[in-house]
Swiss-Prot record:
Protein name per UniProt: Translation factor GUF1, mitochondrial
Lineage: Eukaryota, Fungi, Dikarya, Ascomycota, Saccharomycotina
Role summary: Promotes mitochondrial protein synthesis. May act as a fidelity factor of the translation reaction, by catalyzing a one-codon backward translocation of tRNAs on improperly translocated ribosomes. Binds to mitochondrial ribosomes in a GTP-dependent manner.
Highest taxon of the lineage: Eukaryota
Other notes: This protein may be expected to contain an N-terminal transit peptide but none has been predicted.
Amino acid sequence: MLHIRSWTLPKSSCSTLIWNRGFSKAPVLQVAKVIAVQDKKINLDREKHIQRIQERIEKIPISNYRNFSIVAHVDHGKSTLSDRLLELTGVIQPGAANKQVLDKLDVERERGITIKAQTCTMFYHDTNTKEDYLLHLVDTPGHVDFRAEVSRSYASCGGALLLVDAAQGVQAQTVANFYLAYSMGLKLIPIINKIDLDAADIPRAMDQVETTFELNREDCIPVSAKTGLNVENIIPSIINNIPPPQGDINKPLKALLVDSWHDPYVGVVMLVHIVDGKMKKGMKLLSAHTSKKYEVKEVGVMYPDKTPMDVLRAGQVGYIIPGMKNPREALIGDTFFQNGQHENLEPLPGFEEPKPMVFVGAFPADGGEFKVMNDHMENLVLNDRSVTLEKETSNALGLGWRLGFLGSLHASVFKERLEKEYGAKIILTAPTVPYKIVYKDGTEKVITNPDEFPGADQRALNIDHLMEPYVKAIMTIPDEYIGVVMSLCENNRGIQNEMEYLNTGQVLLKYELPLAQLVEDFFGKLKGATKGYASLDYEDSGYKKSDIVKMELCVSGIPQDALSQVMHRSQVQSRGKEYVARFKEYLKSQLFEVAIQAKVNNKVVARETIKAKRKDVTQRLHAADISRRKKLLERQKEGKKQMKASGRVHINHEAYQAFLRRSD
């Protein structure tokens, strides 16, 4: 009897596992031949498919290229609209299996956000002019934490679709990304999405587009990305309004790095926009910013997955495999030249290395899993060069890491990916931001760890002042909540810059806020104050002089390094009382009295006391034996004094975990 067990692999490979239990090999060979024929047929079909795509691209002039992006607030339907456009151009088939095609990460699909920039090549045949067009959709992140990907993606585009929810109207992220796209010279096409909703108010959304962005309401295209209604009107508008790329295939190669990711089999895969010239397999590349050299192993387009091509031409957005082993060499916004033909060529403008703005300590929940967790951490960092990773040691939590992120959402996504993809359990300390120390001699130092914060004696001797980072926050709220939101901003040390009433019952508020306040769940408080109707976006606003101090949490006089925090002096009293009261909940009683103190510059600002356990040493005494009773109680009291002087409080690992978990 022949037993055959098989499973489905990707189309490029067909594999079957066969066991023959002592019988004739002839049936096995016949099955193997069938499989070989099927494999060959699949490969031939794929080669023909690739050849057809390649031939079609070759026939399209650069004047018929259109590179575009989609500007939208979170959950306004950007990924859904991308799916409809891919279906409309025949890249994918309609169906639930092809949902959020350009969101490759699980966390992107679950949260409904885009984290990594992606692209897809599409063909469109204009039935009126009988011409073919090559479209490149560059799907960008919308959140400010991933602004590096956004700006580089916009740099590869000639225009963008400005997506507005017909029910919610213009939101903060829409405004922030509009200004970024507008400042980069992109042609914007307003799209009013979700017109199928009962709450949709199309005229109101059009009014907001006209008043907020000064775009003609007549240019708005009302669509439903969910049902596909009117989506077919978008591509003709793209062709008629968005200009083609201005590249020249005959000039020396100049390519912009839009994004990159790490593939365990081929190394780094880079998403590039060919500005001038062409790129093909075997070409030697030179990085403008690292001066490192690479040899191209493969070039291709995303259709929607990697599809190898012979060449990428000026104007195209595609992928290359450069033989790069270290992902940290792939710098977003870097320019690549052909080695030997780069003399007198200037790198493309706008390159800026992403700077981490939120730092946390990370420790394994089980200290014995540090080595395994370290491997997981390094693997994840391979795919995200904007994360900084350094090992550190805590007296309280043991071995761990100091991680730097672009923002609080970035940190949250990283933690979620670590837990979901590797099953890791991790503890994050309270987030801190990069503070700046300005010394009396004019030199500066940036600190990202509370342990590096100078003591009172050091500050008095050679430090002139301290500075903290600020951000420009943009909020859109219903006008009925304006009072409570302004109070929230002022309580978080905000400085009002601008207030604009939109003509639809919405208010646009612009505040300067300390970044430290923003990462402490400011958005959660904003949502709570407005019953979920507020939206928020922000951008860097530089450093301002500030009265910053370090608060230590001490148990029996011993500082707990993992619980130290840097904050503004105005927060010390309230935060100190809150911390000592909360930490008291997780400590067990000792045989001696335990003091939990919050200290600033060695001065106690808040205190809680855990009373000592008491053993009844008089239980066997006769009621009338008063002198003996006093003697035993005095001896017990003296013993507890000695224990308090020499004893050390043992704090369970679980106490730190519980306290920090509540601080998240």
